[in-house]
């Protein structure tokens, strides 16, 4: 059961860096719905993208799966024989709850939930890979390498879904969308104190890139086709397709 996010409703004397610990995992569904505009749309559309791209006898990877929302969306929308979903997260608290969520919804497609570092995972025979608000928590120097690995592990015709919070090269646009995102959080019941304290904890661990930077990395990895398919304020999602025909 998800609880309402009140983690930052009272002043915290010493704010450390953000971690996806048990306290965050417990309120995460409420937190992300109230903090990330368009999150539900992205999750449901990932299921539709899975219908289009997932092939029989292949694997789907959900890298940085948190509580498994994207995995469950994929699973609801595919029924291919000999298909498998591999969901990976480095937070023990998230992995434990993700396994519970997966077990609660029975479906024919098997899911393996792994506690581990996505930088160490071997990707192979993939028809779909999901990086849903994950890259922004990696060290900038590690980001190109994970995209290179995804590209190499995708079958021809396979796709990567890359969702992120964005920064903007145009400072005026960046400020407008930043302020609109804060309006969104206020409208969802977060106080100025909650918004400020969470931002302070995230600022050293969540380092955002522009859409242009993401596209440049995807091109460098080898993706011939990459485009923004969804955006709400300073959050959005790209889809990148590896050239070639699906088997």
Curated annotation (Swiss-Prot):
Single GO MF annotation: carboxyl- or carbamoyltransferase activity
GO annotation, biological process: tRNA wobble uridine modification
UniProt keyword list: S-adenosyl-L-methionine, Transferase
Record has S-adenosyl-L-methionine as a keyword: yes
Pfam families: Methyltransf_25
EC assignment: 2.1.3.-
Catalysed reactions listed for this entry: prephenate + S-adenosyl-L-methionine = carboxy-S-adenosyl-L-methionine + 3-phenylpyruvate + H2O
Residues annotated for S-adenosyl-L-methionine binding in this entry: 39, 64-66, 89-90, 117-118, 132, 199
Assembly: Homodimer.
Protein's job: Catalyzes the conversion of S-adenosyl-L-methionine (SAM) to carboxy-S-adenosyl-L-methionine (Cx-SAM).
Family recorded in the similarity comment: Belongs to the class I-like SAM-binding methyltransferase superfamily. Cx-SAM synthase family.
Identification of the protein by name: Carboxy-S-adenosyl-L-methionine synthase
């Amino acid at each position: 059961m998800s609880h309402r996010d009140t983690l930052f409703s009272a002043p915290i004397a010493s704010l450390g860096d953000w971690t996806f610990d048990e306290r965050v995992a417990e309120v995460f569904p409420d937190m992300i719905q109230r903090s990330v505009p368009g999150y539900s749309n992205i999750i449901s559309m990932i299921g539709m993208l899975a219908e289009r791209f997932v092939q029989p006898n292949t694997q789907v990877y959900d890298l940085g799966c948190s509580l498994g929302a994207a995995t469950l969306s994929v699973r609801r929308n595919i029924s291919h024989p000999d298909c498998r979903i591999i969901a990976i997260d480095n937070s023990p608290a998230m992995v434990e709850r993700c396994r519970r969520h997966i077990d609660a919804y029975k479906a024919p497609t098997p899911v393996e939930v792994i506690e581990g570092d996505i930088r160490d995972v071997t990707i192979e025979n993939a028809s779909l890979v999901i990086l849903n608000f994950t890259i922004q928590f990696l060290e900038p120097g590690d980001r190109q390498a994970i995209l290179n690995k995804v590209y190499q592990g995708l079958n021809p015709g396979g796709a990567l879904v890359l969702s992120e919070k964005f920064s903007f090269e145009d400072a005026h646009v960046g400020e407008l969308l930043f302020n609109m995102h804060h309006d969104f959080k206020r409208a969802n019941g977060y106080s100025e104190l909650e918004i400020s304290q969470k931002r302070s904890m995230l600022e050293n661990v969540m380092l955002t890139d522009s859409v242009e930077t993401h596209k440049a990395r995807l091109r460098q990895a080898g993706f011939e086709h990459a485009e923004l398919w969804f955006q709400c304020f300073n959050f959005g999602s790209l889809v990148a397709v590896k050239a070639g025909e699906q088997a």
